[in-house]
Amino acid sequence: MRLSYFHSPDRVPAEGMADAAVAIDVLRATTTMAWALHNGAEAIQAFADLAQLDAAASAWPDDQSLRAGERGGQKLEGFDLGNSPLAVTPERIGGRRIFMSTTNGTRALDRVRSAPMLLTAALVNRSAVAQRLLQHRPEQIWMVGSGWEGAYSLEDSLAAGALADALLEGSGASLLDLAGNDETCAAHALWQQWKDQPEALLRLASHGQRLQRLGDHDADLACCATVDSLTVVPSQDEPGVLRLS
């Protein structure tokens, strides 16, 4: 296995595709996706384009669907949910399909949706995702951070490093053998430095600060910083649709 990290969708190579791709948006899309599927959502259908989301959601019965979305960290007007992992409770989302669009995370998914294996990861499920990859051992794996509007993000790089660390431990490989680019090595070094205080890093990150300025997101930050609290692996079942597999 060779593991490469790209800190935003814009950094993904224009040509070719890896055997497996892992989309990461710790604050907060892929954390919310993991919790939603854990709590019984039928599926999550992700969209970068809001008009496409509206068209798809309108085709589903109201009692079987929910619209979830944010822009700039704030819930979209007229949507049922924003992008908080704490809002996707079993009572709210159980059995329903969530039609979702976020500022950054759904763009990352859209960029690699042609990958033969597409998973989503966050700190909350990094070991479960690592185990899935170790079961299949794809030759080339791309981790794609969501970043913030094309810029680097600390929190996504932390999760990429955490996933790399779990793959190193599970495979017995060296970083020299596993890392496909310098960004993977840098992400792993970031994880080594902050693995004992991930929430502190999320609060240091620019998007963590942005969320704190928008309101009381302490509980969201604590949830997103929890490592290996879930064993779910969201996986693309059909283009743009994530389920548990």
From Swiss-Prot:
Its cofactor is Mg(2+). Keywords: Hydrolase, Magnesium. Its EC number is 3.1.3.71. The keyword Magnesium applies. The keyword Magnesium applies. It catalyses: (2R)-O-phospho-3-sulfolactate + H2O = (2R)-3-sulfolactate + phosphate. GO terms for molecular function: 2-phosphosulfolactate phosphatase activity; magnesium ion binding; sulfopyruvate decarboxylase activity. InterPro entries: ComB-like, ComB-like_sf. Belongs to the ComB family. This is Probable 2-phosphosulfolactate phosphatase. It comes from Synechococcus sp. (strain RCC307). The gene is comB.
